[in-house]
């Protein structure tokens, strides 16, 4: 699963996920892309589950790029622990997703195969997505 090798600080504040993606919003590597329409968080497990769904569908053909990385730690306190006594320990990592962000890219497969693979991947994700084809000159 994806997670940072090391961080300057173990814990991070919650923050607010606002605005639209200004970077990483175009198909840069492959021919087809899966773009986020909605806003939210993707955990490392969700990113991996979607990747596996795509990889299994396209079998040996094609190449997949993951354009997001879960770099924000989410901390949780254990079950049935009283309030107070500090912040909980980091349990998992998430990627904050803004509308317009390119999540995955694919190349070396037909459009029908890519569309179906992205449909299977999108079913694993908690945000709305759309299928994008690379424009000429972009």
Curated annotation (Swiss-Prot):
One of its GO terms (biological process) is translation. Residues 1-24 are annotated as: Disordered. Transmembrane segments: none annotated. GO terms for cellular component: cytosolic large ribosomal subunit. Keywords: Ribonucleoprotein, Ribosomal protein, RNA-binding, rRNA-binding, tRNA-binding. GO terms for molecular function: rRNA binding; structural constituent of ribosome; tRNA binding. Residues 1-13 have a biased composition (Basic residues). Disulfide bonds: none annotated. Binds 23S rRNA and is also seen to make contacts with the A and possibly P site tRNAs. Belongs to the universal ribosomal protein uL16 family. Part of the 50S ribosomal subunit. This is Large ribosomal subunit protein uL16. It comes from Burkholderia multivorans (strain ATCC 17616 / 249). The gene is rplP.
């Amino acid at each position: 699963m994806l997670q940072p090798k090391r961080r300057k600080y173990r814990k991070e504040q919650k923050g607010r996920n606002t605005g639209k993606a200004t970077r990483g919003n175009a198909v840069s590597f492959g021919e087809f892309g899966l773009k986020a329409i909605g806003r939210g968080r993707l955990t490392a497990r969700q990113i991996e589950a979607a990747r596996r769904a795509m990889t299994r569908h396209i079998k040996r053909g094609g190449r997949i790029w993951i354009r997001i990385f879960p770099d924000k730690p989410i901390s949780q306190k254990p079950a049935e622990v009283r309030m107070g006594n500090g912040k909980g320990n980091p349990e998992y990592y998430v990627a904050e997703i803004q509308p317009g962000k390119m999540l995955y890219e694919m190349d070396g497969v037909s459009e029908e195969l890519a569309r179906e693979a992205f449909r299977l991947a999108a079913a694993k994700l908690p945000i709305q997505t759309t299928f994008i084809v690379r424009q000429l000159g972009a």
